[in-house]
């Protein structure tokens, strides 16, 4: 089950001594992706295919910033709708970070023999325009 696999992955990351910031980023990314999967009735890690990854990227692009919360009941409300950037486009850098975090999870799943291959393809990352770089 995806949710249990994520918990096992997080435990493995903790045993490896990954930084707290990295752990938080992984967990948040994988929870948000888990919500996306649950909305589509996907509960098993082995059910996830490349078209799900593409659909998730499209969904992230369309929904905008802060429109989904990784935690169902936050400890304290932070009123994301009050932010000036609420609903604005999610940057390619952020989407690439999500993909990198998801790729780490799926690579772990392959090593643990939970899945046969990583559903994220190398060309899924988005080309990022660099600001202020002069050739």
Stretches found by the model and what they are:
Residues 2-6:
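Onset of an N-terminal alpha helix
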Residues 7-24, 31-133:
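N-terminal core-binding DNA-recognition domain of tyrosine recombinases/integrases
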